Design a protein with these regions (language model features):
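Active-site histidine-anchored catalytic micro-motif
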Residues: 2-147
Length: 147
């Protein structure tokens, strides 16, 4: 697929955690990405692919291979991956070593999207812009974390 279309691969991380008021802890239910895309008024075609909803500290080699497989199979040349920040660089290294002819950026959050003053919306928007700007210049997996 060419043009402006992008694929968003959802893996979980703090980005997608929900605060469970009953248990008083952060859990996973479903991804916040569809709501974020709506709020960000993204006008290009976007395919959202739920890959897994886990904390990146629990991500193992087979989980990373599932992300790589999704990237390999994607028709889109431009991919944004939501990912936990703790092991984002490990996944980025695997994706970069694969040598895919695609622009792949990973983004995460230090504060869940659902929580006030979260960095998730900003980080997603920044990566979308980075993905668009870097599309023709780089075919490596990019990973930047904003603190």
């Amino acid at each position: 697929m060419s043009g402006e279309a992008i694929r968003v691969i959802v893996t979980g991380g703090t980005f997608d955690k929900h605060y469970d008021e009953i248990r008083g802890e952060l859990t996973f239910r479903e991804s916040h990405v569809p709501e974020i895309l709506k709020r960000a008024r993204v006008k290009v075609p976007v395919a959202v692919e739920p890959n897994q909803l886990i904390d990146s500290l629990q991500m193992q080699d087979e989980n990373r291979r599932a992300v790589l497989d999704s990237c390999s199979r994607a028709e889109e040349d431009r991919i944004v991956i939501t990912h936990g920040t703790d092991t984002m660089t490990t996944t980025a290294a695997l994706l970069g070593a694969a040598g895919l002819e695609k622009t792949i950026v990973l983004t995460g959050a230090m504060v869940p999207y659902q929580v006030q003053d979260s960095d998730a919306l900003f980080n997603f928007g920044e990566k979308r812009g980075q993905e668009a700007g870097d599309h023709r210049r780089s075919q490596k997996a990019l990973c930047k974390i904003r603190f």
